[in-house]
Design a protein with these regions (language model features):
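Extended beta-strand/beta-hairpin segments
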Residues: 1-56, 67-147
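Alpha-helical metal-binding/catalytic segments enriched in His/Glu/Asp
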Residues: 61-62
Length: 147
């Protein structure tokens, strides 16, 4: 590891509560109930699934990265929304299921006169999202930036 490189650690806890349901949490944060998605036995559409959490983690990490780059460059973000769809499929090489693609559509509004600069920061936001950097899935993001 290079000298001066930061290392971050994140601790979580999981407790099985029966069937195919568990509670996950982290110190000082509310618990989430997690079940399989509707495609699998034991699903409960009222709860998050690991697959939905993975997709949402890419969305939220991309947003936080974009907001950080905008803040560092004096761009005021007025609004930000995104939609994402994750594609889980069997891989050809090892026949295991994995996310192979996540497609996101981001719609953001920035303060007047900064749309061009904000558009230029989108590639940095994608590059610097820690979750994107940690997956082998292709992450495709379509940005709609307006003033």
């Amino acid at each position: 590891m290079p000298l001066g490189s930061k290392v971050f650690q994140y601790q979580t806890e999981l407790e099985w509560v029966g069937g195919r349901e568990c509670r996950v949490g982290a110190p000082g944060r509310p618990d989430l109930t997690v079940t399989p998605p509707e495609d699998f036995p034991g699903a409960n559409a009222m709860h998050w699934s690991p697959e939905h959490l993975f997709t949402a983690s890419l969305q939220s990490c991309t947003m936080l990265s974009f907001l950080a780059h905008c803040a560092h460059n004096g761009v005021e973000v007025v609004s930000y929304q995104s939609e994402a769809a994750g594609e889980l499929a069997r891989r050809e090489d090892d026949r295991r299921y994995a996310f192979r693609r996540v497609a996101m559509i981001v719609t953001a509004t920035v303060a007047g006169g900064h749309a061009h600069l904000a558009q230029g920061l989108t590639a940095k936001a994608e590059r610097d999202c820690f979750i994107s950097a940690s997956t082998t899935a292709t992450v495709e993001t379509a940005w709609r930036i307006s003033e």
